[in-house]
UniProtKB/Swiss-Prot annotation:
A motif ('KMSKS' region) lies at residues 270-274. It is found in: Cytoplasm. Keywords: Aminoacyl-tRNA synthetase, ATP-binding, Cytoplasm, Ligase, Metal-binding, Nucleotide-binding, Protein biosynthesis, Zinc. The gene is gltX. It holds the Pfam family tRNA-synt_1c. Catalyzes the attachment of glutamate to tRNA(Glu) in a two-step reaction: glutamate is first activated by ATP to form Glu-AMP and then transferred to the acceptor end of tRNA(Glu). It comes from Treponema pallidum (strain Nichols). It catalyses: tRNA(Glu) + L-glutamate + ATP = L-glutamyl-tRNA(Glu) + AMP + diphosphate. This is Glutamate--tRNA ligase. One of its GO terms (cellular component) is cytosol. Its cofactor is Zn(2+).
Length: 537
């Protein structure tokens, strides 16, 4: 049997960590079994679904390197245009079971619902909004669970025909059995049984506008697309008995279900905005590498072996198995993800890292003015921080290639790069005097250090690495201060910041002349009125 799985989100928002984890597990499962990964868009909620969010789905998966074999948004396959039903059009990928957007499949859903009506397993409901609101209030008052009261379930055929002939607005509801239970075996959670009386009473299958509800479209599409395994979040467990009843009503074999563990924040609640970034776009714009995010998300609720954290996509595909999934919720650890990101950044070659950090540097305006026409064109097309407005000049690229080895160990995110490299492309800002003065030094001592630094930079540029360290320690001892306190004023003078790339490397790249000029500028602007402690140089 060919394994066929799917990721079927609704394009009602940006792709978030929970959805990406579901997509990734389906992708890995398909690859582990040489199967097919289908991407289906469930856009039946016409009031909330947008083309922009659908495009975000495709962009996100492509950025992560999660490829699909059938589905929408695939430029690699033959494409045709299909009507969405709302005046817009969308590209549908090739595949034997398309289209892969539900709004283009409404005829199929209506035909299948008609089958259920004919066999007495679904019925027309003519209750209007005011009556349904009265039912809701009564059930709430009587402390009954929410749901329909089955008022139209036993309408006589002639009553139904009369209402239809009169054009009374209607929906079509499913007849949930009034007794008995529905049982299924979940691949992760084991045996689950649900009393039919606890299932939402006679849910709507087809809405008054002719569009299907999620439950109908989900079941019809999974059957029509030959889906063999459904891997989805545990929040869908309560819906599974209804889906199984629909499979039974249609006379279809259901797929194997596997409900994945929830993704929680550190406080034990479902991961949400209050915990931090949750959408893939946020992580992308914050300077995370797709490989790092993919690797970390793949480990949320799944174990791949002891003693190893970093896996390539190919290794994840080879190791993934439903037997490796954990039943308990996974906790999203932002610090651990940051560690992953740093590891992947440092594994990049200087050439690769130069290309990766350039967009963030250019977008931060570090490398100078971007021509207005170039910037205007870039603004129209650029949606992510890792999309550059222009390519670097040869001089900019050459400078970056010298700086990258200096900053690589200090990068946790690509967004760290602009401030670390700014001093190599621009004259630094001039902080207030207090920024130059460590807690254990006074203003006079700092001025003396800076005066001495003017002469030191020439020696630093020409000396070997071991000799430079000996030289700097000796100078700090002459002043009777710690090495870190000795270097701090020099660092701020050269970079404008208390945190920077390694100081010796910075001086060598800037050169003696440029370094001396910056130190002179600081002495003149911030320490010219202080004549104390000039000695020591």
């Amino acid at each position: 049997m060919e394994v066929r799985v799917r990721y079927a989100p609704s394009p009602t928002g940006l792709q978030h960590i929970g959805g990406i984890r579901t997509a990734l597990f389906n992708f890995l499962f398909a690859r582990a079994h040489a199967g097919v990964f289908v991407l289906r868009v469930e856009d039946t909620d016409r009031s909330r679904c947008t083309a922009a969010f659908e495009q975000n789905l495709y962009d996100t998966l492509r950025w992560l390197g999660v490829s699909w074999d059938e589905g929408g948004g695939c430029p690699e396959t033959a494409v045709k245009q299909g009507a969405r039903g709302d005046g817009r059009s969308v590209a549908h990928a090739g595949g034997a079971y398309g289209p892969y957007t539900q709004s283009a499949r409404t005829d199929l859903y209506r035909a299948q619902v008609a089958r259920l009506v004919e066999t007495g397993q679904a019925y027309y409901c003519f209750c209007d909004a005011s009556r349904l609101e009265r039912v809701r209030k009564i059930r709430t008052l009587n402390r009954m669970p929410p749901g329909y009261d089955r008022h139209c379930r036993e309408l006589l055929p002639e009553e139904v025909r009369e209402c239809l002939a009169s054009g009374v607005p209607h929906v079509i509801r499913f007849k949930v059995p009034l007794e008995g239970s529905t049982h299924f075996r979940d691949a992760l959670l084991g045996d689950i049984e649900w009393q039919n009386e606890e299932i939402n009473p006679d849910p709507i299958l087809l809405k008054s506008d002719g569009f299907p509800t999620y439950h109908l479209a989900n079941v019809v599409d999974d059957h029509a697309m030959r889906i063999t395994h459904v891997l989805r979040a545990q929040e869908w467990v309560p819906s599974t008995p209804l889906h199984l009843l629909l499979y039974r009503a249609f006379g279809w074999q259901p797929p194997l279900f596997c409900h994945l563990p929830m993704v929680m924040g550190a406080d034990g609640h479902k991961l949400s905005k209050r915990h931090g970034a949750t959408s893939c776009d946020e992580f992308r714009n914050a300077g995370y590498l797709p490989e790092a995010l993919l690797n970390y998300v793949a480990m949320l609720g799944c174990s791949y072996g002891e003693g190893q954290d970093l896996f390539t996509r190919e290794q994840l595909c080879a190791h993934f198995s439903l037997s490796r999934l954990n039943k308990s919720p996974a906790v999203f650890d932002y610090k651990k993800l940051a560690w992953f990101n740093g590891q992947y950044i440092r594994a990049k070659s200087d050439e690769q890292l130069c290309a990766l950090v350039w967009p963030f540097i250019a977008n931060a305006g570090v490398c100078g003015h971007i021509p207005a026409d170039v910037e205007a064109g870039a603004v129209r097309t650029r949606r992510f921080a890792d999309e550059a407005p222009c390519a670097p000049t040869e001089a900019q690229r050459s400078m970056l290639m010298r700086v990258i080895p200096l900053i690589k160990e200090r990068l946790r995110f690509l967004t760290d790069a602009p401030e670390l490299v700014r001093c190599f492309f621009q004259e630094p800002s001039l902080p207030e005097q207090g920024v130059f003065v460590p807690k254990r030094l006074d203003v006079a001592q700092v001025r003396a250090v800076l005066v001495r630094a003017r002469g030191l930079v020439h020696e630093i540029v020409s000396a070997s690495e071991p000799d430079v360290e000996v030289l700097l320690r000796a100078e700090a001892e002459k002043f009777g201060i710690k090495l870190g306190d000795f270097l701090m004023p020099i660092r701020v003078a050269l970079t404008g910041a208390t945190v920077s790339a390694p100081l010796v490397g910075t001086i060598r790249i800037l050169g003696a002349s440029r370094s001396c000029a910056r130190i002179e500028h600081v002495i003149r602007e911030r320490f010219s009125d202080d004549s104390q402690g000039v000695g020591g140089g």
